[in-house]
């Protein structure tokens, strides 16, 4: 499944509002446009017109990722997603995974810590490890939905990005790490143990090279 930046924003807003304000869901074009252009909880901040949002909805409808719903006695058309967790969706996500994908669609690459802090209205993570577990599950799917970005210079933590929008990947200068890359939260003891094993292996290799050189002389 591939989305444009505008499609990702629309889907993200529909997911968010379904979870946080279910009484107002599905959304009208006006409400959806306001949600897309919010000044908070959105990165980047956009300024889409209703016409642009409507064009995006038309594109998503062709991909069968949204549907229209008209209320009884109302002429206002409202929109709901078919992105995941519906009878029409191939994609099924648990609550933790859904909250994670929603935030990545709305706010771009983020660290596990940022995702936990920003997810309180979508899903309650008890700690960062639960966020990392959700990210790991999403990254290890047959068709990965997220990937770990290389750590930025001067930053303590690496960020994760969603893989629905190729535009986002093209804009970043960070190489994408393999989905099976070791998480950056490995304990100090694990890292020290790994370094010790590597040092032993390097020492053995040096000894073998020295033996080979001695035989060649």
From Swiss-Prot:
HAMAP family according to UniProt: UPF0502 (MF_01584)
InterPro entries, per the entry: DUF480 (IPR007432), WH-like_DNA-bd_sf (IPR036388), WH_DNA-bd_sf (IPR036390)
Family according to the record: Belongs to the UPF0502 family.
Gene3D superfamilies assigned: Winged helix-like DNA-binding domain superfamily/Winged helix DNA-binding domain
Source organism of this protein record: Shewanella piezotolerans (strain WP3 / JCM 13877)
Record protein name field: UPF0502 protein swp_3027
């Amino acid at each position: 499944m591939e989305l444009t930046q505008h499609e990702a924003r629309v889907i993200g807003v529909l997911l968010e509002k379904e979870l946080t304000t279910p009484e107002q869901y599905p959304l009208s074009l006006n409400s959806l446009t306001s949600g897309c252009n919010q000044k908070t909880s959105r990165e980047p901040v956009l300024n889409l017109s209703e016409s642009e949002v409507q064009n995006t909805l038309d594109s998503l409808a062709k991909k069968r990722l949204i549907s229209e719903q008209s209320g009884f006695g109302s002429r206002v058309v409202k929109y709901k997603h078919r992105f995941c967790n519906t009878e029409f969706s191939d994609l099924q996500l648990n609550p933790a995974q859904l909250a994670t994908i929603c935030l990545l669609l709305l706010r771009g690459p983020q660290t596990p810590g940022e995702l936990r802090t920003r997810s309180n209205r979508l899903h309650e993570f008890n700690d960062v490890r639960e966020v990392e577990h959700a990210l790991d599950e999403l990254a290890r799917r047959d068709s990965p939905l997220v990937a770990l970005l290389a750590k930025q210079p001067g930053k303590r933590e690496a960020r994760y990005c969603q893989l629905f929008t190729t535009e986002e990947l093209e804009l970043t200068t960070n190489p994408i790490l393999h989905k099976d890359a070791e998480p950056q939260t490995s304990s100090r003891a694990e890292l020290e143990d790994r370094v010790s094993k590597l040092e032993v292996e390097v020492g053995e290799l040096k000894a073998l090279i020295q033996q080979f050189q001695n035989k060649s002389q």
